[in-house]
């Protein structure tokens, strides 16, 4: 597996990557020969050679089908896993190469910092006239919050992710130029050990993960990766500011984290009041345990003796106070440590943390008290020649406490608007509640939302579940503090009545503070094209409502709105979704400003382009002026979490990129573009006609039958990827009821990737026919929004394969002749206009590194896809009863996901 097509050319900086891929590819070959047989390796090589030849000659997939069809399920599974293992090592090599390139930039000492990093952002800001004073005034307004979700798009189980980390560590160690030959041999042995253990581990769990499993999975990234790199992020920022401006102001907290795991009830009956309480408790235990361990290490480090160095009087006073507060813990102090006040104070701080965990006397009442203790130690060290005797390590812990508090990550709660509406209708005994217009419902809800009247309690299941949720939130606020709770998100929000409903239910559930207000940030989520269009009217109605405005005043006159990238794309296609999101932000900002409210956005992005994925820096550059304003809250879903935060060095890079992008977009937003006034109608036309084409396709008679036959959606629904069902419970198989994640996942597996491009060509053609070709070319050149949109579509197109998609389509029988020509024609139209407007002869011509990465993978994905089609046809012939075929199909899904590096 170490030969390459001659046409694959690596740029000079990427030659080490080429060498790694060759070396690791050879290692995969050795693994296959050892674990299966030499004959099996020979067979893999024959298939691989055929796949490469087929790509080079643009031959049909039938050349592969002859070698692959009709295999026994176990043989097919082994073959798929062989190619998947190749993807695994290539993905690892590419991640390690990113670390290598980062180190090369840092070592170079040149005036050109790594693009999109903090040094790059600050140099660009200074070049644009930003002074240190202006930067210092802005820093307290910066608030970057990645929010981790448990959507079922992570197709790799944790046991394999952990082994992947071992492989990464061995390769990173090998980057050290001082390694001896024996050490390099040891590095290779460690890599092979982890790779072999991975081969002997099943790709997926036989049971669906619980909410607790998902919580543990996300907690791994928070406690094992981000906990480690957060202080380094601030140190990097300090270094960048000092290098750019000569001095460093005191840095506020810029980063925090959120999570939906345990709080996302939308469509998931496994999430309720118990998981909310359990998640908050588990996160509290996890982060306090980390603090205790770190304080233990600090106690050993801070062994300064009063016979040799002084400590501050304030620290000695605190030590005596803690001895009185925690007499049992003080009595356990070792006499030989009596002259080590830092060590003694650290021991008592650990005892306070244990009391906090146990809800016992002497507990910290808030993270700020622990911060004060750490600051006391820092001040004493600084005043007594201790800057190089532990100050650095103590400050790292202080940054962690500021970032993670006692809660680790803020927990959001989400539920669909219809669930709230049904509960209120039952409580009020109004069977026609849904039939009443929003204005009438808002008027009825007003007295309950403001507390003038009590919403009646009823004992049905829906009301009982919601009452328990709000009671759990009230208890959590008391026990864990307000910082532990994020937002309450209303999915499928349509009007102000949906928001007032939550306010009324929260009051009934007891979520009321001492001032009589509901201490909850309620966030409407606009996620269909129509709701995005109507979002401005909804927010205007909401902010004009006296009851809600009173609530908002108690929340600092700041309103958050969540924008749904996934469902809007499924609803109207990617062009309408992107443009609807762009317009909605502009209009919502204007409406909120007119009413004296600060509006912030929560971006519900997924991993794939169809669901809003892509580089954060480019997304913020393309965002409307003023839409960032120091704040970035964005979901991190599924495989994105692993890709961005699975390795510490890359997690640090991701945090730097987000923070740098927010600084640039906030302090020096893009200059106003007068031409946008005439570009917008052109984009309106593109979006409108794109939607017409997209909906004509997905709303055609028998389309859902075609979708279910021409994609492996039935396999995906049988996989144990997450705790949430793929379809809203109790609803039929209509497209509107299918979750956006499996929708995108299925089309990606079938290599048609419909959600990422369908309709775009028709929209662009309509604009050209209307005489706007020059405007489109101008937009592609000078409008970051449109350029980013086209680049994203180009990337999706480059990952698709029409020939493979046709194999899947033929599984639909007679429906193939009706639907596949539409796909083929729209694809040709889209690809033609995207290349023309980007002025490229081939897709991704401007991004040769990404193009090379995709070309490296495609010949290895093709055999898996061809096998997948054959296995799918045979499995369906058994009515989905053959478990051996299903296991092989699951291996195919995992293999294609590894190759494409995205799922849903």
From Swiss-Prot:
GO terms for biological process: carbon fixation; oxaloacetate metabolic process; tricarboxylic acid cycle. GO terms for cellular component: cytosol. This is Phosphoenolpyruvate carboxylase. The gene is ppc. It comes from Xanthomonas oryzae pv. oryzae (strain KACC10331 / KXO85). Forms oxaloacetate, a four-carbon dicarboxylic acid source for the tricarboxylic acid cycle. It is an enzyme of class 4 (lyase). Belongs to the PEPCase type 1 family. The active site is at residues 151, 570. Keywords: Carbon dioxide fixation, Lyase, Magnesium. HAMAP family: PEPcase_type1 (MF_00595). It catalyses: oxaloacetate + phosphate = phosphoenolpyruvate + hydrogencarbonate. SUPFAM superfamilies: Phosphoenolpyruvate/pyruvate domain. Its cofactor is Mg(2+). GO terms for molecular function: magnesium ion binding; phosphoenolpyruvate carboxylase activity. The keyword Lyase applies. Residues 52-71 are annotated as: Disordered. PANTHER family: PHOSPHOENOLPYRUVATE CARBOXYLASE (PTHR30523:SF6).
């Amino acid at each position: 597996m170490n030969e390459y097509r001659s046409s694959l050319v690596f740029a000079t900086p990427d030659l080490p990557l080429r060498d790694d891929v060759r070396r690791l590819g050879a290692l995969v070959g050795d693994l296959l020969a050892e674990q299966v047989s030499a004959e099996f390796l020979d067979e893999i090589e024959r298939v691989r050679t055929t796949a490469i030849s087929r790509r080079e000659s643009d031959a049909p997939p039938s050349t592969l089908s002859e070698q692959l069809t009709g295999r026994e399920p176990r043989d097919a599974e082994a073959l798929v896993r062989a190619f998947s293992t190749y993807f695994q090592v290539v993905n690892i090599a590419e991640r390690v190469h990113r670390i290598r390139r980062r180190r090369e930039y840092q070592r170079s000492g040149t005036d050109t910092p790594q693009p999109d990093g903090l040094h790059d952002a600050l140099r660009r800001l200074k070049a644009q006239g930003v002074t240190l004073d202006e930067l210092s005034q802005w820093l307290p307004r910066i608030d970057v919050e990645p929010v981790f979700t448990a959507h079922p798009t992570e197709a790799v189980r944790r046991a394999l992710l952990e082994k992947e980390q071992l492989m990464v560590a061995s390769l990173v160690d090998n980057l050290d130029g001082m390694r001896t030959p024996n050490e390099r041999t040891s590095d290779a042995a460690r890599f092979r050990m982890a790779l072999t253990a991975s081969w002997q581990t099943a790709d997926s769990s036989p049971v669906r993960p619980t909410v607790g499993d998902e919580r543990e999975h996300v907690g791994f990234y928070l406690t094992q990766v981000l906990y480690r790199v957060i202080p380094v992020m601030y140190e990097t920022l300090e270094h960048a500011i000092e290098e750019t401006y000569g001095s460093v102001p005191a840095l506020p907290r810029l980063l925090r984290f959120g999570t939906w795991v345990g709080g996302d009830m939308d469509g998931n009956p496994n999430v309720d009041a118990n998981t909310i309480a359990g998640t908050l408790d588990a996160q509290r235990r996890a982060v306090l345990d980390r603090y205790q361990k770190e304080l233990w290490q600090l106690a050993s480090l801070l062994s300064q003796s009063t016979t040799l160095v002084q400590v501050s009087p304030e620290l000695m006073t605190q030590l005596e106070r803690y001895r009185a507060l925690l007499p049992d813990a003080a009595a356990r102090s070792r006499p030989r440590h009596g002259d080590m006040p830092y060590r003694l104070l650290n021991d008592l701080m650990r005892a306070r943390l244990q009391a906090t965990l146990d809800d016992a006397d002497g507990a910290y009442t808030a993270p700020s008290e622990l911060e004060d203790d750490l600051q006391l130690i820092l001040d004493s060290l600084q005043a007594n020649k201790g800057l190089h005797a532990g100050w650095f390590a103590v400050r790292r812990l202080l940054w962690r406490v500021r970032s993670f508090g006692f809660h680790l990550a803020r927990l959001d709660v989400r539920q669909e608007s219809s669930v709230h509406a049904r509960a209120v209708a039952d409580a009020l005994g109004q069977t026609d509640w849904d039939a009443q217009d929003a204005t009438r419902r808002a008027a009825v809800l007003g007295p309950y939302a403001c507390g003038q009247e009590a919403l009646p309690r009823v004992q049905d299941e829906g009301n009982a579940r919601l009452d328990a949720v709000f009671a759990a939130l009230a208890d959590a606020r008391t026990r864990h503090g307000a910082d532990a709770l994020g937002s309450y998100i209303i999915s499928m929000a349509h009007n102000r009545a949906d928001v007032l409903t939550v306010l009324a239910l929260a009051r009934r559930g007891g979520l009321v503070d001492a001032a009589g207000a509901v201490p909850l940030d309620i966030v409407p989520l606009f996620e269909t094209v129509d709701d995005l269009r109507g979002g401005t009217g909804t927010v205007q109605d909401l902010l004009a409502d006296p009851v809600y405005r009173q609530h908002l005043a108690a929340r600092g006159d700041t309103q958050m709105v969540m924008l749904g990238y996934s469902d809007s794309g499924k609803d109207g296609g990617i062009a309408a979704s992107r443009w609807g999101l762009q317009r909605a932000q502009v209009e919502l900002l204007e409406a909120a400003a007119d009413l004296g409210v600060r509006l912030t956005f929560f971006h519900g992005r997924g991993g794939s382009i169809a669901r809003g994925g892509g580089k954060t820096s480019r997304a913020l550059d393309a965002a409307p002026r003023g839409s960032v304003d120091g704040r970035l809250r964005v979901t991190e879903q599924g495989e994105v979490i692993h890709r961005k935060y699975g390795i510490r060095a890359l997690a640090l890079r991701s945090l730097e990129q987000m923070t740098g992008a927010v600084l640039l977009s906030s302090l020096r937003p893009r200059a106003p573009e007068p031409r946008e006034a005439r570009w917008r109608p052109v984009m309106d036309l593109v979006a409108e006609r794109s939607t017409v084409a997209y909906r004509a396709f997905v709303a055609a008679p028998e389309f859902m039958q075609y979708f279910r036959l021409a994609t492996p959606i039935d396999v995906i629904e049988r996989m144990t990827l997450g705790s949430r069902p793929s379809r809203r419970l109790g609803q039929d198989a209509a497209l509107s009821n299918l979750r956006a994640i499996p929708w995108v996942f299925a089309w990606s597996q079938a290599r048609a990737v419909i959600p990422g491009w369908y309709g775009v060509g028709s929209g662009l053609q309509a604009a050209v026919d209307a005489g706007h070709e020059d405007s489109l070319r101008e937009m592609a050149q000078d409008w970051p929004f449109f350029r980013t949109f086209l680049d994203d579509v180009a990337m999706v197109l480059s990952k698709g394969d029409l020939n493979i998609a046709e194999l899947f389509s033929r599984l639909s029988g007679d429906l193939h002749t009706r639907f596949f020509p539409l796909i083929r024609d729209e694809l040709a139209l889209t690809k033609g206009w995207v290349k023309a407007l980007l002025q490229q002869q081939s897709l991704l011509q401007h991004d040769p590194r990404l193009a090379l990465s995709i070309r490296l993978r495609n010949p290895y994905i093709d055999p898996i896809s061809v096998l997948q089609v054959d296995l799918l046809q045979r499995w369906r012939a058994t009515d989905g009863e053959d478990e051996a075929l299903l296991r092989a199909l699951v291996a195919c899904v995992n293999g294609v996901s590894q190759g494409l590096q995205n799922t849903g």
